[in-house]
Amino acid sequence: LRKPREVLDHSTTETKSIFVKIDKKKLQKIELNKIVLIESLKDYIRIKTDLGKYIIHKTLSSFTDELPPDKFIRIHRSFTVAIDRIESVEGNSIEIQGERFTIGRSYITEVKSKILQDLIS
């Protein structure tokens, strides 16, 4: 488990990757399409990717705001997920890579409408 210290200038809707500062001299490139989910750890976040996990000193809200809204959605105060990684939705939970995550009450309407919108388009 690598522990990057911070994220440098972040993504826009057209950005395909972000750079994470791992130490004073090294930046690690993370492809946005490799991100599975982001979990809040108070003032830190854990970014789970296909290739590993990264812990970054940043809040979930500020990091989520910098991600493309058509690719990622906040499902709970503790989780933001990649929309294309959602395997199923049942009641107030989603499944990603065989693991169930509860959708928070304040996020359920947005999550379901976003998923329906993706089905229509």
Predicted regions: what they are:
Residues 107:
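Conserved short segment within the HATPase_c
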